[in-house]
Amino acid sequence: MDTRPIGFLDSGVGGLTVVCELIRQLPHEKIVYIGDSARAPYGPRPKKQIKEYTWELVNFLLTQNVKMIVFACNTATAVAWEEVKAALDIPVLGVVLPGASAAIKSTTKGQVGVIGTPMTVASDIYRKKIQLLAPSIQVRSLACPKFVPIVESNEMCSSIAKKIVYDSLAPLVGKIDTLVLGCTHYPLLRPIIQNVMGPSVKLIDSGAECVRDISVLLNYFDINGNYHQKAVKHRFFTTANPEIFQEIASIWLKQKINVEHVTL
């Protein structure tokens, strides 16, 4: 038994979609979450800067005595995950491979779409992972840089959000049977995305898929938490306004949480 928390990092609130699934599947595990909303989005930033910011988040989580770090951010996974994984002596998990694997299982026509931040799409990481495992699958990637600001400003239900999503996804409509939400912010726009793409297109939440791998690693390294612990205290940190973060988090997690401000 290992009662240390699992650390989650993201550029903002998007990683809460992963946390929500982890709380559902592994309610006995403690969580420490850091969202860098003050510097979001990461997608348009240079690689060097994304690496620098990611390491700051990692180092913060290490001060919290975490037993595992989850990159609940596709951009950070694409740019810095391999480097961090090689440098640390605790398990470090990203969201890309679980999402790619789920897309391969889902597609029936071999036509997969991937939407993400400009950096995630430019890295071509999803296409590489998918075609490494299933070379015959055609992958269409599309950067959606306006999605993260919508979520970070809590405007997911606005008419502007609907128009932006509709206009952004137009190039993929009718051309794919599976769509990877290659940014953990995007599931917060899922109803609009599904409506635009149509009911026949399967949406893959890369973050939710990641939780299955978390469970496997906890077992493999024998670091599961206390299964009998009922009241688990999580900690949430943000580099921006805690009230805005708390508002979004409480809606998504369906519980009121306390959010602490941190300066990196």
UniProtKB/Swiss-Prot annotation:
Q: What does this protein do?
A: Provides the (R)-glutamate required for cell wall biosynthesis.
Q: Which SUPFAM superfamilies match?
A: Aspartate/glutamate racemase (SSF53681)
- Source organism of this protein record: Streptococcus pyogenes serotype M49 (strain NZ131)
Q: Where does substrate bind?
A: D10, S11, Y42, G43, N74, T75, T184, H185
GO MF terms held by the record: glutamate racemase activity
As its record notes, the protein acts as a catalyst of: L-glutamate = D-glutamate
Catalytic center at which residues?
C73 (proton donor/acceptor), C183 (proton donor/acceptor)
Q: List the disulfide bonds.
A: none
Q: What is its EC number?
A: 5.1.1.3
One family name in Pfam for this protein = Asp_Glu_race
Name one process (GO BP) from the record: peptidoglycan biosynthetic process
The record lists the lineage as: Bacteria, Bacillati, Bacillota, Bacilli, Lactobacillales
Record-stated family? Belongs to the aspartate/glutamate racemases family.
Q: Keywords, A to Z?
A: Cell shape, Cell wall biogenesis/degradation, Isomerase, Peptidoglycan synthesis
Protein name in UniProt = Glutamate racemase
Which pathway does it serve?
Cell wall biogenesis; peptidoglycan biosynthesis
Taxonomically, the superkingdom here is Bacteria
